[in-house]
Amino acid sequence: LWRLFKKKRKKTYPVKDVSLHELKQAIRQYMNELPDHVPLSMLINEDLTINYHELAPYLNAIPIQTYYMSKETYDIFDETQRHLAEDLDYTQRAVDQYIDLTSELPVIHGDPYLKVSYHKLMKRGLITYRPPHEFFIDPKDHLINLKKPK
């Protein structure tokens, strides 16, 4: 009877080194258990860091290192690549707005690789600076990525 009135303690998890692969596996598990109406972006903090307290039960740990996740594409980056997560979100939002405005992809006409045209995005006032890397658009889902299609 006494157990009914005892407060349940939150489980504490050790802080340890977690690889990117382990983190991705934990996120996959977390995603599979999410209700359909709850987006994965609930796992991403405002500064694009990952909410480790939500993932701790899947990792059985709290990662030492800081990982970042794009809210737009859900790509994951380590601390040295934080700028990529920020630039991906920035550019993906602009690409989505461009498609909404023009019903076209913001690429140079005839480009077989579908490289994002920063010029077209700037011309429409959708971006104010050009990210230092090239992004490519997937023709199926219109998500951008860093991989040049073959």
State where each predicted segment sits:
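Short acidic linear motifs
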Residues: 1-150
